Amino acid sequence: MQKKYYELFFIVEERYKNLFLDFAFDLGIEAIEEKDNGVYIRSHESLEDLSWALEIFAQKLTTTFNLNHKIISNLSLVEKENKDWIQEYKKGIKPILVDNVYIHTTWQEEKKNCINIKINPALAFGSGHHESTYSCVKFLQKFSKSKLRALDLGCGSGILGIIMAKFGCNVEICDTDELAIDSSLENARLNGVDFYKAWCGSIDKANGLYNLIVANIIADVILILEKDIKNHLEDNAILILSGILDKYSTRIKEKFQDLELIDEMQINEWCSFVYKNNKKG
């Protein structure tokens, strides 16, 4: 064991915390702990580049969300005496229960009488705690049914695709990030499920129609993919759209007004909508 390690600390607004965690995971950082209203990142390697990258990422988010204040504060980088911080990191990750779905890490015990979803957080791309993912998990328990042809559009960690597979759907996944596909396939293996098809890219590469599509991606991308999404919906198919900031909700509803809005949910500023393809008008 090396004698010293580097510790990067910062405080981030709760609503944006998961964006920063996913950003760090995407850069290959595995030892992250949430504690004392802040985030600790530890490594034997220098974290100076990561510190700089987090500041740039925060600036971009501030611009994207039109904020007039800083998202992160108290950013500090120190060198410390070593200890088993991997075990400390594991203690800081909490499982999440969404109705009957229990999402937990590979080292946490399963919960009886629940649908257990096992995730390796070191694989990045989300662990189910974000408001948008939470909403999708609730909706999928209602609309996932055996033998449905389903698509997880922008699969990330594969949590949503795994849930649909657990309910008996024939699931396909896609993401524009090859690492997300790898992460999803590995998490599927951990959960004993298979995806019917997986590809790096978007819905334009999909073949045929789907009975269920879930897209937990940002509003701008949903708006860009609107026509492709609709063109791949079977009659009476269910479409779940999530990852939408409330300031974009009106635009989303306008674009999808030809479908029947059958359910919606908002947690903090994050909105999710469920549509049925009844071919209105």
Curated annotation (Swiss-Prot):
Localisation per UniProt entry: Cytoplasm
CDD domains the record matches: AdoMet_MTases
EC id: 2.1.1.-
GO annotation, biological process: methylation
Subcellular location, principal: cytoplasm
One Gene Ontology molecular-function label: protein-lysine N-methyltransferase activity
InterPro entries assigned to the protein according to its UniProt record, in alphabetical order: Ribosomal_L11_MeTrfase_PrmA, Ribosomal_PrmA_MeTrfase, SAM-dependent_MTases_sf
GO cellular component: cytoplasm
Binding site for S-adenosyl-L-methionine: 133, 154, 175, 216
Highest taxon of the lineage: Bacteria
Catalytic activity annotation: L-lysyl-[protein] + 3 S-adenosyl-L-methionine = N(6),N(6),N(6)-trimethyl-L-lysyl-[protein] + 3 S-adenosyl-L-homocysteine + 3 H(+)
Keywords: Cytoplasm, Methyltransferase, S-adenosyl-L-methionine, Transferase
Sequence similarity: Belongs to the methyltransferase superfamily. PrmA family.
Functional summary from the UniProt entry: Methylates ribosomal protein L11.
Protein name: Ribosomal protein L11 methyltransferase
Lineage: Bacteria, Pseudomonadati, Campylobacterota, Epsilonproteobacteria, Campylobacterales
